[in-house]
Design a protein with these regions (language model features):
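Short-chain dehydrogenase/reductase
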Residues: 87-91, 132-147, 169
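Conserved Rossmann-fold NAD(P)-dependent oxidoreductase catalytic core, especially the SDR/UDP-sugar
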Residues: 95-137
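Single conserved hydrophobic/aromatic residue that forms the stacking wall/gate
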Residues: 190-207
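N-terminal Rossmann-fold cofactor-binding loop
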Residues: 30-34
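Conserved catalytic-site loops of classical short-chain dehydrogenases/reductases
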Residues: 64-66, 109-113, 161
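N-terminal Rossmann NAD(P)H-binding glycine-rich loop of SDR-like oxidoreductase domains
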Residues: 3-21
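NAD(P)H-binding glycine-rich loop region in Rossmannoid oxidoreductase-like domains
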Residues: 46-92
């Protein structure tokens, strides 16, 4: 399959690109700028959603588009400016992709758009699934707007899939190095009522 991946130089995107390529798929990367985080020789195209620029060539004959783009949410401080960037970068880029695909004569059969488990808000130990309603808070609102941005344009030939990721952990990348830092200095104070002892144990042993 010919698969286009945006956000392909991020933590999840880079690992997913390599995994799918190892499975024999033809991976096309959409990147905002030339990145050093490209571990193998993938076909790469620049796009600029802020200026509504998306190249035609990589989409010709594509089977699926996976959209993972958006400002990193791992930050020491979520200022109002950063929160706006987190939301805008996801909603705007998704709208650009969806609009483009809606106008294609032969569009890809699948559009897979990242979302977040934060869609459900703070559920503590309550189990949720795709039938549950959106929660409250910044992440819930962002995830809702992000998913809704795919509904603004009619996609008759393309199935849309929203993937509500939970916390993805890796010892060297993503959120783990930051959230495991207190363990290294022996100063963690944990008071959450939600039972996450197994997660905490794994974090402590890996720190």
């Amino acid at each position: 399959m010919k698969i286009i991946i945006s956000g392909s130089t991020g933590f999840i995107g880079n690992n997913l690109s390599n995994y799918l390529a190892d499975k024999g798929h033809n991976i096309i990367r959409l990147v905002r700028k030339t990145s050093k985080n490209i571990s193998r020789n993938f076909e790469t195209h620049l796009w600029d959603p802020d200026n509504h620029y998306l190249p035609d060539k990589p989409f010709i004959g594509s089977d699926a588009v996976i959209h993972l783009g958006g400002r990193k949410i791992i930050s020491l401080r979520w200022t109002e400016k950063i929160k706006k960037e987190i939301c805008y970068s996801r909603v705007n880029s998704t709208e650009i992709l969806t609009k483009f695909i809606s106008k294609m004569e032969k569009p890809p059969s699948k559009l897979i758009v990242a979302s977040a488990g934060g869609f459900y808000g703070n559920t503590l130990d309550q189990k949720v699934d795709e039938s549950d309603n959106v929660g409250t808070g910044f992440l819930a609102k962002t995830a809702e707007e992000w998913e809704n941005s795919t509904f603004k344009f009619k996609l008759n030939k393309t199935s849309v899939i929203h993937t509500r990721f939970g916390l993805v952990l890796d010892k060297k990348e993503g959120a783990f190095p930051l959230i495991s830092m207190p363990f290294k200095y022996g100063c963690l104070l944990y008071t959450s009522p939600s039972p996450r002892d197994g997660l905490l144990s794994r974090m402590a042993s890996s720190a």
